Amino acid sequence: MPLLIVAIGIVALLLLIMGLKLNTFVSLIIVSFGVALALGMPLDDIVKTIEEGLGGTLGHIALIFGLGAMLGRLIADSGGAQRIAMTLVNKFGEENIQWAVVIASFIIGVALFFEVALVLLIPIVFAISKELEISISYLGIPMTAALSVTHGFLPPHPGPTAIAGELGANIGEVLLYGIIVAIPTVLLAGPLFTKLAKKIVPQSFEKMGSIASLGEQKTFKLEETPGFGISVFTAMLPVIIMSISTVITLIQETMGLADNSLLAAVRLIGNASTSMVISLLVAIYTMGIARKIPIKQVMDSCSTAITQIGMMLLIIGGGGAFKQVLINGGVGDYVAELFKGTAMSPILLAWVIAAILRISLGSATVAALSTTGLVLPMLGQSDVNLALVVLATGAGSVIASHVNDAGFWMFKEYFGLSMKETFATWTLLETIIAVAGLGFTLLLSLFV
């Protein structure tokens, strides 16, 4: 019965978002109330549960998400992202242009959120495509593959950051293992899949695409942008700090070293929130002050970034509220009881649930957060590495993007594809990322 109620709730969510065109956040809150009532939760507890879920989720990720958005905006507005992309293109040359786009997209994708990175990179990729007279899809598929993988697997992106917080996973481990899983996944879903896509829908590689909807794009002369080295360093600084801290902590645990104030300081600096604060301060200097940009202009970029993520934060909070209703309403315990004694790995189970919710709901972040509410009770009975459960959930949450996902329509319109061509490229690309991500995560679980 609880699963039937959840299924009805998901259908209702679909109808509200797609049928009635209601705002996603509002729809999530309405469905959270409805599901809570249907599950028989005490009336006095319903509002408390929704507030607990929304506040608990945002309390963990709002700082990381907000600082990450500001960091990305500074890199974009200073021309640092354009410098990274164009330098790699010039170094790799026309013959290896696809690899240049993949590497640039991966680096920029770590620092910028999916939509921001896509809007930033697409004009650059279009310009390269036009200059070299090659298909926009030939460059666009590996570009979106890299952005989608970083979005689904790597902190400080909202999905993996929020899941790690809900499951109590070490965010540094999520980042470290996420990079290990992400690199081969990008190679499969990017350059290798492009060859397959060219055979499946060759006509899509003849389309010109259009970026008119993006309006006038801010472009920089290369000499006006920050240096390549400092741009890459600034974009990757959160990754560097968290990775070093995680490696030191793993060495401490492996060697059984006694805790001390130095190791405590390393953990503090390596905490996701602290590393983002440090990285933002560095970016304010390297992308602004060091280049004689007025501090007001730098702060305007930061303010713009916060304005742009306001609704996304509310949607994440709404997903957290729905997740908490599933937990407090007993659905998570019911699922745990259902799978009690089964041989199914929590990693695989998390992926399956996230995949089903993703196909149903469209939003990767909402699917991932809702999944945590269902698998969390099971994890107490397992010794599985929580960072791997985060990665599996992230992988499942990007599967089979279709008409209920904004990314589907963005890809279709920018690259000028038909519905059939979009399904054969974008939807298949996202599915390859999900399946490859699961495969590499399961492989990694044999060693950690």
UniProtKB/Swiss-Prot annotation:
Q: Which domain of life is it from?
A: Bacteria
Q: List the protein's name.
A: Gluconate permease
Q: Which InterPro entries match?
A: Glcn_transporter
Q: Name one GO biological process term.
A: D-gluconate metabolic process
Can you say where in the cell this protein is located?
A: Cell membrane
Query: In which broad location class does this protein mainly occur, judging by the first location in its UniProt entry?
Result: membrane
The UniProt family comment states: Belongs to the GntP permease family.
Q: Which GO terms describe its cellular component?
A: plasma membrane
**A single GO molecular function, which one?**
gluconate transmembrane transporter activity
Q: Does the keyword Transport apply?
A: yes
Q: How does it sit in the membrane?
A: Multi-pass membrane protein
Corresponding gene?
gntP
Q: Where are the transmembrane segments?
A: 2-22, 23-43, 52-72, 106-126, 134-154, 174-194, 228-248, 269-289, 302-322, 347-367, 373-393, 428-448
Record key words, sorted: Cell membrane, Gluconate utilization, Membrane, Sugar transport, Transmembrane, Transmembrane helix, Transport
Pathway named in the protein's UniProt entry: Carbohydrate acid metabolism; D-gluconate degradation
